Amino acid sequence: MELNFMRILATIINFIILILILKHFFWDKIKRAIDARQEAIDETILKADEDAEKARRLRLDNERILKSAKEDGRKLREEQKKEADRIYKEIVDDAHREAESIINRANIEIQREEEKVKYELKQQVVDISVMLSEKALGESIDESKHRELINDFIEKVGI
């Protein structure tokens, strides 16, 4: 196989002419198609980056909102617990005051009853003493004077 220099040269020249013709008629269209494709790819990448950034911001916002909601819930629980404790303390304090009031009224009533019983007992002692004196003496004595004497005696004795 022999190399034909003229043929090689003609092929190279034909190839160069073909490239020049293609460049002249089609290079701008190919360049525009490549540029358009590159621009579309760049826009897609940019949009993907923007979407990723937007998703990241949304995630951060959601995390912040969730954290805030948890904190608000915790504060609300604490406030409700404090309010419940306050109401509980108020109820217990009211119950203690009421119990104290009942005990005080009962003590006052007991003192009244005790005074009443003492007075009634004193009157019975006076009546019995007057009756015994009359029986012992066999006659009636001045009852008011006798009662006064007996009352004085009882006061001195401390009944």
Curated annotation (Swiss-Prot):
Its main location: membrane. GO terms for molecular function: proton-transporting ATP synthase activity, rotational mechanism; proton-transporting ATPase activity, rotational mechanism. It is found in: Cell membrane. The keyword Membrane applies. The chain crosses the membrane at residues 8-28. Keywords: ATP synthesis, Cell membrane, CF(0), Hydrogen ion transport, Ion transport, Membrane, Transmembrane, Transmembrane helix, Transport. InterPro entries: ATP_synth_B-like_membr_sf (IPR028987), ATP_synth_b/b'su_bac/chlpt (IPR002146), ATP_synth_F0_bsu_bac (IPR005864), ATP_synthase_B_chain (IPR050059). It comes from the Bacteria. It is a single-pass membrane protein. The keyword Cell wall biogenesis/degradation does not apply. One of its GO terms (cellular component) is proton-transporting ATP synthase complex. CDD domains: ATP-synt_Fo_b. Coiled coil: none annotated. F-type ATPases have 2 components, F(1) - the catalytic core - and F(0) - the membrane proton channel. F(1) has five subunits: alpha(3), beta(3), gamma(1), delta(1), epsilon(1). F(0) has three main subunits: a(1), b(2) and c(10-14). The alpha and beta chains form an alternating ring which encloses part of the gamma chain. F(1) is attached to F(0) by a central stalk formed by the gamma and epsilon chains, while a peripheral stalk is formed by the delta and b chains. Belongs to the ATPase B chain family. HAMAP family: ATP_synth_b_bprime. F(1)F(0) ATP synthase produces ATP from ADP in the presence of a proton or sodium gradient. F-type ATPases consist of two structural domains, F(1) containing the extramembraneous catalytic core and F(0) containing the membrane proton channel, linked together by a central stalk and a peripheral stalk. During catalysis, ATP synthesis in the catalytic domain of F(1) is coupled via a rotary mechanism of the central stalk subunits to proton translocation. Component of the F(0) channel, it forms part of the peripheral stalk, linking F(1) to F(0). This is ATP synthase subunit b. It comes from Clostridium perfringens (strain SM101 / Type A). The gene is atpF.
